[in-house]
């Protein structure tokens, strides 16, 4: 039976460390601020925005919400981003995705100052991740690394398999594992021998958005299994991309859904915002 990797506990430690550093900066008169922009009234986006504001309050940051109507034009949003780029109170800018269809998401991401791009989506920061000279780490992959480290697993030389090649998780995840000297394989919808590849993984990270896709016969005995997926079943329950009940019997460590990777994403967003404030004030 696998050991459970408790994302709530690990994320609480990350946030507590951020809170202590933020308090030390506040004592020097340095306030930290995160601007969160939401366009339209997507219920899921509203939940995410509220959780980010709550996390800011927990760690002692100021949060600034900008709620724009669904019909906002691309130029109007670009104008707001420009204002926030120049705002000294704002250390991080987060534009909640998805955006309405009339707005080009890439144009907005590219307009955010790389120094305030705490999601690490800007091409400049993506390039920095590629060469291993990063200030900001993409929040979900960075959170996954913290969870792997919490198990005491040494990534060096391990067979690491990432299922999924998205720009947000799969690609940067593979880079972070590679920078730690993992032997990395990326699998995707066109991979022909997926089962055989996964069964060799010492560390398996799954991020494809397909409920219970990874079954026990795809998992190596004693593997570390990180489930990034979040799917809602017909009965309303949440589940990941891994068949938890079956894989748990075979894995060495496994993340639950919910309560695994999810809490880490917001914790790492707080860490990136702190990093931005420290960089701005010449502390790193």
PLM feature spans:
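Short, well-structured alpha-helical segments in soluble
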Residues: 76-88
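Short glycine-/small-residue-rich Rossmann-like dinucleotide-binding loops
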Residues: 98, 208-210, 229-230
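Glycine-rich phosphate/diphosphate-binding loop of Rossmann-like nucleotide-binding domains
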Residues: 39-53, 135-224, 237-245
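Rossmann-fold NAD(P)-binding glycine/threonine-rich loop
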Residues: 106-117, 122, 126, 229-281
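Positively charged, low-complexity intrinsically disordered leader regions
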Residues: 1-30
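Short beta-strand elements in bilobed, periplasmic/extracellular small-molecule ligand-binding domains
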Residues: 34, 56-70, 184-186
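Short glycine-rich, flexible loops that bind phosphorylated cofactors or substrates
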Residues: 101-102, 212-214, 233-234
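Anion-binding alpha/beta catalytic cores of soluble intermediary-metabolism enzymes, centered on
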Residues: 94-155
């Amino acid at each position: 039976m696998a050991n459970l990797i408790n994302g709530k506990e690990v994320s609480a430690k990350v946030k507590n460390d951020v809170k202590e550093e933020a308090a030390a900066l506040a004592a020097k008169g340095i306030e930290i601020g995160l601007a969160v922009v939401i366009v339209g009234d997507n219920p899921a986006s509203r939940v995410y925005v509220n959780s980010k504001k709550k996390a800011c309050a927990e760690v002692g940051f100021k949060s600034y919400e900008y709620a724009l109507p669904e019909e906002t034009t691309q130029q109007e949003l670009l104008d707001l981003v420009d204002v926030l780029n120049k705002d000294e109170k704002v250390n991080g800018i987060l534009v909640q995705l998805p955006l309405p269809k009339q707005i080009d998401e890439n144009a907005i991401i590219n307009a955010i100052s790389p120094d305030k791009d705490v999601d690490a989506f800007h091409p400049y920061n993506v390039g920095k991740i590629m060469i291993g000279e990063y200030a900001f780490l993409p929040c979900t992959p960075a959170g996954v690394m913290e969870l792997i480290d919490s198990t005491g697993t040494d990534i060096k030389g391990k067979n690491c398999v990432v299922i999924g090649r998205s720009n947000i998780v799969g690609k940067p995840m593979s880079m972070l594992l590679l920078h730690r000297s993992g032997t990395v394989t990326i699998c995707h919808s066109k991979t022909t021998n997926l089962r055989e590849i996964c069964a060799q993984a010492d560390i398996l990270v799954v991020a494809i958005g397909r409920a219970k896709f990874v079954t026990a016969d795809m998992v190596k005995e004693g593997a570390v299994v990180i489930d990034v997926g979040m799917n809602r079943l017909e009965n309303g329950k949440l589940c990941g991309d891994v068949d938890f009940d079956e894989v748990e019997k075979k894995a060495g460590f496994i993340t639950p859904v919910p309560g695994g990777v999810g809490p880490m994403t917001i914790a790492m967003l707080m860490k990136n915002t702190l990093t931005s404030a420290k960089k701005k004030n010449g502390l790193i």
